[in-house]
Structure formats: structure tokens, C-alpha cells
Swiss-Prot record:
AB hydrolase-1 domain residues: 119-497
Name of this protein: Tripeptidyl aminopeptidase
Main location: secreted
Species name: Streptomyces lividans
Domain of life according to the entry: Bacteria
Record bears the keyword tRNA processing: no
InterPro entries found in the cross-reference section: AB_hydrolase_fold, Pept_S33_TAP-like_C, Serine_prot/Carboxylest_S33
Propeptide: 37-39
Disulfide bonds: none
First and last residue of the signal peptide: 1-36
One Gene Ontology cellular component: extracellular region
Role, per record: Cleaves tripeptides from the N-termini of proteins. Does not cleave mono- or dipeptides, or N-terminally blocked peptides.
Length: 537
């Protein structure tokens, strides 16, 4: 489940090389020997060998070329002194001399002295489909939380392959993508299910028609290889990395493929890296976690009934939600906000407790008779063509990566059985999430076997950060990665649930992230932090 994706979608989707490798690797960049074929017994074998050689060729080439930094284009909306550039990578790492694509990158230099500089810190915000180009703005915005880290590191962002300015892909016309209202995600009949299945199939077909050449190469391992090429282009021998949400899985895959290329790695709000979870089961697990965090928000709203007047028990708040949902299903608010748009708007509350008060306030206004506030918040803006194109692109990348990364059930009966059962006790998100991912059931290109994430030779301690009640990436994912990456440390924010907790308001977490990035030191044992304060109305 990508944040705000429901609201934004239109459907409810050789030999010569080896010789050159040896020559290039002897120069500017060390051979990523750890990225050779993982001994996982799942048939990657020769293809992984070819892609490992291709990644080495591309990294060596990038190290020689560097990056031509210049002022960012005006339509990138990045303030000076942030600089922008491109890094060239193979579309297919098995064919490193074949078609090339350009990846957009940006940076801002460290704010400290030359002697304080430790290198570049590269960021991925998640998705898949999220752009990291806003990361350097944490320096221009003078964020106090990042001030110490900014003294030591250049802040570097990038658009992953397929995203934004990096060979963007598309699955449907953006203006069609944002039209509303969408069909109610909760099916009322078998006919409703057939209609949603048709939309999902058409979306998958649209991805192939509009972006078919890129689809087979839209995988997390390829993005990890891209990340290593960016590292080399920056002139960095080792990677310093901060990944949030899906960015944690990207980091886990990178750490498995290139363990001896990691210097520091912070992963925050962790995707469960188990092959059994990527990606079908992971989305079912999300539905359970979202229901729990939805209830947390309802409890908070009830505790603040004096401010919101939505009921002083969770049951009363839920009753108001069901009434709103039923009204929108019967007659979309403002003609454009139905149940799908409501879920897209209200899902901000389970994602981030910073959204608790704004979401409750708009809900309260609706119950008090002000429908327009909710329409303004939940309806798409058809005049925002740039924003709509970005939203469509983000959803296309999400679908392409998750559908290509792993095998999904092709039998509709499996989807119907699992989601019908789950919906009974976890109704908030289940069917909406199912329809979003259903294009993977009819995906038109080969689906891969996920990498076996594990500790390789040279991997340093990785810092894992996780809130205990995170909805989008349930806590068990952090525990799983902690077990797989030997020597890692886990920081848990107890009884909290915000998704992405580094750089927020808990000094118990922020101070430890700072210490790790600046010194490499971690606590001798895993740490449990008290929760940050709950929001005020």
C-alpha cells in the first residue's frame, strides 16, 4: 500500500564484458565481489553472475565519469544551493553495453569544515515510487534535527529508475488516473468483484503498452545496483545510506548484494524481507496492522471528544465513520468523494500521528454540517496536471516493482478467499489494498524470485529503527531484518505507530541515529524508547 495511492489511481495497477570488467575494476572502484550470484538455491545462478558483472562495469564507468553538477532546472523546484545531475546506468545489468538510462540525482554539500566531512549520505523515502530529491532540502530548510549530520555529510537524493526524472514509466493517462469517484473498494456482489478484476487486468495491460520495455527491469535488485553505481559516481568507496519504508527493503537488498560496500546504514520502518512476505503476504499483513492503528486513532479521537464531538468511545467514532462511508457510497460528496476517496484521505491517520488532529478536525466539520472541508481535502485536483502526472508515475512504479519483484497468486480464488476472510475483522483497508495490487495477478512480464536477504562478508553493524505499532510496515519486519543482519541494532519506539520515525520528535531515537551516523557506534544492546508525546487537538 502506497500512501495516497487509492485516491490517485484510475483503476481500482558475455565474454567481452568479462574482460572489460577486469580492466575497469582495476581502476577507480573495487570489484563488488559480494554481489556475485547469491548461493540461495533458487535458480538465480548465471543471471545473477551476469548482472553482478554488469553492475561492476557500470560502477567502474560511473567512477571514471563522475557527475556533472549544475543548478537544478526550474521545474524541479529545488532551491539553491542544491545542485542536480545525472548518473547513467544500464537498463538491463545483464547487458551493460546495451540500452542506458539516466538517473536524476541531487546534492547539497556538508555544512561543516572539510575535515568534518565524512562523505555522502544517500536517501530513499520509500514507495516503491517515491522520489528522494527533496532530501537535500532538509539542509536548506535548516532542520535542527539534521544539523549535526549535515555538518559531516553531503545530503544526496535520487529518483530511482522509472521515477520522476529517471526514465519515468506510466500505466495510464494521468488525468484519467485521478478521475473520481472510484468504485467502492468493498464489493457488494460478485459483479462488483468482476468489475474490479477487469480494471486490474486493464491496468496491467496499460503498463505493458506504455512502459513494456522497462517493466522486466523494474526490480529492487536493479535499483540496488543503481544505488551502487551512484555511490561510485559520487566518488565514494563506501555507501552511507538512510532508507525509510520500502527504502529499508532496498537497503536490505543492497546490503546483501554489496555487504563490503556499506559504511553506515540506517533503515527506518522496515519492510519484512522474508521471501515468504515479498510481496503478497506483506500486503495482507498491512491490512491487519492498519486496522490496529485505525483503532488507536479512534481511541484518541474519543478521548478528545470535547474538541471533536465524534463520540467518547471508539465504537461511537466508528459508527460516525460507517455513517459517513454509507452516505458517500449512496451519493458521493460533492459528486467526487466516494468510499475510495474517503479511505485514501483517512489512511493518513494510521500512517502518521501528525495527521491525527487535522483528520479529526475535518471529520468533525463534516459531522457538524460542513461537507465542503472534506471534499476539498479528499477530492482530486484535475487542474494540477504536474501533480497528477507525478501521482500516476508513482503508482506505476509501485505496481511495476512489486509485481516484478516476486511471484503473486495468479488464481483469483486465492485472492478472494484471503481478502474475504481478512475483511471480516480488518475492514478498513483490506479490499482497497487488494484491488491496488491485483494487477500483479495478470502481470505481463516474468516475475522474479526475491533475494534471500542475509549477512555477507564485510557488512558492518546496521541500525534499525521502528515504531511498535507501525501500520504500513508492521513491527515484525524489523525483528526479521535484525535477525538476518548479524551485528545490527534495533531501536524500538514502544507504544507508538508513526511510519518513519527518524528526524521526528523523539530524542531517544534521534540522538542515537546521530551518534551512529557520526561515529559508527551503536548501543551494546537493543534499545526500547518510550513513545513520543501523543498529539494535542
Amino acid at each position: 500500500m502506497r500512501k495516497s495511492s487509492i485516491r490517485r489511481r484510475a483503476t481500482a495497477f558475455g565474454t567481452a564484458g568479462a574482460l572489460v570488467t577486469a580492466t575497469l575494476i582495476a581502476g577507480a572502484v573495487s570489484a563488488p565481489a559480494a554481489s556475485a550470484a547469491p548461493a540461495d538455491g533458487h535458480g538465480h545462478g548465471r543471471s545473477w553472475d551476469r548482472e553482478a558483472r554488469g553492475a561492476a562495469i557500470a560502477a567502474a564507468r560511473a567512477a571514471r565519469a563522475g557527475i556533472d553538477w549544475e543548478d537544478c532546472a526550474a521545474d524541479w523546484n529545488l532551491p539553491k544551493p542544491i545542485q542536480c545531475g545525472y548518473v547513467t546506468v544500464p537498463m538491463d545489468y545483464a547487458k551493460p553495453y546495451g540500452k542506458q538510462i539516466r538517473l536524476a540525482v541531487d546534492r547539497i554539500g556538508n555544512t561543516g569544515t572539510r575535515s568534518e566531512r565524512q562523505g555522502a549520505l544517500i536517501y530513499n523515502p520509500g514507495g516503491p515510487g517515491g522520489s528522494g530529491l527533496r532530501f537535500p532540502a532538509r539542509v536548506t530548510n535548516k532542520s535542527a534535527v539534521w544539523a549535526n549530520t549535515a555538518k559531516a555529510y553531503d545530503f544526496v537524493g535520487f529518483d530511482p529508475r522509472g521515477v520522476g526524472h529517471s526514465a519515468p514509466i506510466s500505466c495510464v493517462d494521468p488525468q484519467e488516473f485521478v478521475k473520481a469517484p472510484k468504485a467502492d473498494p468493498v464489493p457488494g456482489s460478485e459483479a462488483d468483484k468482476r468489475a474490479q478484476r477487469k480494471l486490474a487486468r486493464e491496468y496491467a495491460e496499460g503498463c505493458f503498452e506504455r512502459s513494456g520495455e522497462m517493466l522486466p527491469h523494474m526490480t529492487t535488485p536493479n535499483t540496488a545496483r543503481d544505488l551502487d553505481v551512484i555511490r561510485a559516481a559520487l566518488g565514494e568507496k563506501k555507501l552511507n545510506y538512510l532508507g525509510v519504508s520500502y527504502g529499508t527493503y532496498l537497503g536490505a537488498v543492497y546490503g546483501t548484494l554489496f555487504p563490503d560496500h556499506v559504511r553506515r546504514m540506517v533503515v527506518d520502518s522496515v519492510v519484512n524481507p522474508s521471501r515468504d512476505k515479498i510481496w503478497y503476504q506483506a500486503n495482507l499483513d498491512q491490512d491487519v496492522a492498519f486496522e490496529g492503528r485505525w483503532k488507536d486513532w479512534q481511541d484518541w479521537v474519543a478521548a478528545n471528544d470535547a474538541a471533536y464531538h465524534l463520540g467518547d468511545t471508539r465504537a461511537e467514532v466508528q459508527d460516525q465513520w460507517l455513517k459517513l462511508r454509507a452516505a458517500a457510497a449512496k451519493k458521493p460528496l460533492g459528486g467526487v468523494v466516494g468510499p475510495a476517496e474517503l479511505i485514501s484521505f483517512f489512511q493518513s491517520a494510521p500512517y502518521y500521528d501528525s495527521a491525527w488532529a487535522p483528520t479529526a478536525e475535518i471529520f468533525s466539520k463534516y459531522v457538524a454540517g460542513d461537507t465542503q472541508a472534506l471534499v476539498d481535502a479528499a477530492a482530486p485536483d484535475l487542474s494540477d496536471t504536474a501533480g497528477n502526472a507525478s501521482a500516476e508515475n508513482g503508482n506505476a512504479v509501485y505496481t511495476a516493482v512489486e509485481c516484478t519483484d516476486a511471484k503473486w497468486p495468479a488464481n483469483w480464488r486465492t485472492w478472494d478467499r484471503d481478502n474475504t476472510r481478512l475483511h471480516r475483522d480488518h475492514p478498513f483497508m483490506t479490499w482497497a489494498n487488494a484491488w491496488m495490487n491485483l494487477p500483479c495477478a495478470t502481470w505481463p512480464v516474468k516475475q522474479q524470485t526475491p533475494l534471500n536477504v542475509k549477512t555477507g562478508k564485510g557488512l558492518p553493524p546496521v541500525l534499525i529503527v521502528q515504531s511498535e505499532r507501525d501500520a504500513a510496515t508492521p513491527y515484525e519486519g524489523a525483528v526479521e531484518l535484525h535477525q538476518r543482519f548479524r551485528g545490527s541494532r534495533l531501536i524500538t519506539e514502544r507504544d507508538a505507530g508513526s511510519h518513519g520515525v527518524t528526524g521526528l520528535v523523539n530524542p531517544c531515537i534521534n540522538d542515537r541515529v546521530d551518534t551512529y551516523l557520526l561515529t559508527g557506534r551503536t548501543d551494546a544492546r537493543d534499545v526500547t524508547c518510550a513513545p513520543h508525546a501523543t498529539p494535542r487537538p
